[in-house]
Amino acid sequence: MSHRLFAVAAALAVVVLVALLVQTPAAGQNQPQAGKAPAVGKAWTPPRTADGKPDLQGIWTDNTLTPFERPKKLGTKEFYTEEELADLTTRARKGEKLEEADLGAANPQAVRYDLEVYGFDRTKLRFASTKRTSLIVGPEGVVPPMLPQAKERNAERAAKEKGHEFDSYENRPLSERCLLMNQERIPMTPGANEGNLLQIVQGPGYVTLVHEIDHSTRVIPTDGRPHVPQSMRLWQGDSVGHWEGNTLVVDTTNFTNLTAYRGSSEKLHLVERFTRAAEDTMIYEFTVEDPTTWAKPWTAEIPWTKTKGPVFEWACHEGNTMISTILRGARVAEQEEAQKKGK
C-alpha cells in the first residue's frame, strides 16, 4: 500500500508541476475564436502521447450559448438547421451587446473592464458545434423528473438547515469557503464565463484535469486499478479511467451526500467520456445515474473548444473576508432582534 501511495503522490507532483509551469499570474480566461463553429470530423485521428495514448492535452473551454435543458417550445426537436443556428447566434450576440450598452448607460461612472481580455465577452460565444438544441441529449432534452423519495429527502435536508444558515462557517456553501467551486464540480457543465478554462495534462497511467477556477486538480488513474472501498467517500467521488479506442472513459463512484448534484444522493454514479474529435474540438459526454433520485439515467454532451490560454492565476481565499463578514453581520442582526424583543 505504501508503494502505491508513493507512486500516486509522485505522479501527482509531476503533472501538477507541468500544469503550473504554463500558468501566468492574472485573473480571467480566454474565449474561443469567434466565427463559424468547427465541424466535428468523424474520420479525424488524434495525435498520440509518448506512451501511445490519444493526446487530449491542451487548454479547453466549455463556454456555449446552448442551454443545458431544451426550451419547452422546441418540444422534441433535437437539432437546429444551419439557418436556424446562424439566426440564433446573431440575435444572441446582438442581445449581449445591447445588455452591455444598457449597463454602461445606467452607470457611466462604473469601472469598465476589457471584457475580451478577462473572458466576460459573451458576444463571441456560439452555440454547440453539434447543432443540438440542448446539452442534454435525447428526445426529452431535459433532466428527468425527480422521484418522490428524492423530493422528500431534499425537503427534509432543507428543513433541517433552515434557520441555521449563519450559525457557523460550516453552514455556509463550499464555494463561499473556497473549498469547491461550481465550475470544478463533476460532472463539468458550463457556468459563468469566468473560470471555465480546463487544462488537461497526461502522463503514463494518469490523466490530470487542472481547473482554472480555484486551481483544483483532479488526477485520474488509467492503469486498471479498481475503485477504493465503498467505505471511503469523497466530495468529488473516486474516479478511475480506461481507454476505449480514442475515447477516455472515466467511471466515478463513492460520492458523499454533502456535494449532491442536482439533488442526488451518495448513490450517484457518473460515467464521463472524453473524445478529441478535431484539432480544436473535444466532445465531453457524461451519463448520470442515481436510482434513488431519477427513474432512469440521463446523458449530456458538451463540445469543448481549444484555446491558446494561458490559464491565469485564480485567487479565491487570499484577502477573502466574506465568511467572517457574513457571520459578524448575522451576530449583529441577532443582537438587534433580541433588543427589539427586550431580551
Describe every region a protein language model picked out.
Residues 2-343:
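PEST-like low-complexity, intrinsically disordered acidic/proline/serine-rich tracts
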